[in-house]
Amino acid sequence: MIKLLKKIDIEFYLILFLLSGMFKNLLFSIYGNNIKIPLTIIFGILLILMIYIKDIYKLKRLKEEYKSFIFLLLFFVWSLFSISYSSSENYVWYKLLGLGTNFLAFFGVLIMKEISLKRFTIYFSYFTYFFSLIFFMINPNSISKNFIFHDYFNEIYIQGWYLVLGQFLIVNMLLIFSFSEKKKIIYNLLISLNIICLLGGRFPIVLALLVFFIISIYLIQKKYLNKKLLMQFFKSLTIIILINSVLNLSSKTYRSLLLRSVYRFEVLSSSFNDLNFLNDQENYQESLNQENNSFNKRLEYLLFSKTKIFENKSSLILGYGLGSFSNEYDQTDRRLYPHNIIVEMVFELGLIGLLLALAFLISNSSSYKGFFTNLALLAALTLLINSMKSSSIVDLRLLFALLAISIFHFNKLTLQN
């Protein structure tokens, strides 16, 4: 058994750990939330064990590179200290454990002798496409509320996947440039962009289009584009369009996904007034109201945070303590956050917590050389941007792993491929 496990790439175990939350949500949707399997902890322990068993650790890097993570450790120590004045009694410990998994992702990558970004990307792509397929099959956010597999899956546990998968696919759009085959890069780039549009996350769609535009400009400036490459791109694009056309004609689920992507932008624009193309006005209006409520709720969280943060000097400098947001907001002790990690850090850990986080990023600025060729760093940046709108600081395992790869394992992989 051990011999079999040793043959599996360490990047596979790392991906299992980083995406453990997705596996957990999928299990909940099948068996309900009564199932008590701590997948993140199990996969985290498995990752560390395989690093040891495969003998691919380099512990002396902890001593050699301590300046790269000293502020990250101080951030964790400050988070621990803030528990002493946090109003949360129960959730705070879950949040502390979540922070711990972020640091495990960072230090797990740090102590590895080497990591292949290409193998990492292959496994990451496979799993991301797999979860996207599951999401499309179940279609948990269907406007018609007609859930095909309702007898087998409880769709409520994966309704938020459209945002998470959107973030992951943007990461994939950048990491695939670690491949050497141009055809594979183009197809994966277009497939990722296509899936993001079908998922319907507004911000991921906008950011994905921006990333695609920047990649195009970069390739043009560096004169990497040639006639052969353009022919391959348009050939691949034609195939993707044909597949989408067939699905649009033959699949009701596909049309439902496409429709949802269109109407979600109505929340941000008043120009979408012609709704005659919709067959189910009542369900559409109900879904639209839910989208408006979601948008308004996030705005309410931000305004509430602003008021509380500047309430006094103590709240600004020290914050209200780790895991305290829900207690301060509605006197409940549960998972709740303002959907912006900077606001979340200042609210719970004060300016001290924010400055420690910034110090960690700034202290590694020398490792960010070759910015446009450091694919892991670019991918981490997109996750950081996304986290300003829809993440909590305990949900950033992938971000921390990519930062560690960009700092300790950057080997000048370029977009020239």
Identify what each model region corresponds to.
Residues Y126, Y218-L229, E348-L384:
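Hydrophobic transmembrane alpha-helices and their immediate junctions
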Residues S287-L349:
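Long extracytoplasmic/lumenal interhelical loops at the membrane interface
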